[in-house]
């Protein structure tokens, strides 16, 4: 999603691959997968982001997500 990242492509791709393996293991349909991933995002925001920054971080995440699926 991000244009510049402090994480390597290898780190990101490895984490994505592991998450997708879990979803495939559970034969999770798309709607369940999105629900679970969304709940993970909420969990991270609530526990790892200071309350005064949560709304802005959530909005930045949503904007980046929308941009990542936007048709060219």
UniProtKB/Swiss-Prot annotation:
Residue ranges of the TM segments: none
Look up the domain of life of the source: Bacteria
Q: Which InterPro entries match?
A: UPF0352, YejL_sf
Please give one Pfam family short name: DUF1414
Instruction: From the UniProt annotation, give the residues forming the signal peptide.
Output: none
Record-stated family:
Belongs to the UPF0352 family.
- Which protein, by its recorded name, is this? UPF0352 protein SO_2176
């Amino acid at each position: 999603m991000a244009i510049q990242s402090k994480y390597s492509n290898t780190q990101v791709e490895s984490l994505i691959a592991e998450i997708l393996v879990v979803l495939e293991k559970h034969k999770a349909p798309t709607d369940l997968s999105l629900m679970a991933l969304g709940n993970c995002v909420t969990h991270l925001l609530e526990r790892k982001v200071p309350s005064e920054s949560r709304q802005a971080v959530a909005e930045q995440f949503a904007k980046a997500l929308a941009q990542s699926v936007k048709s060219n």
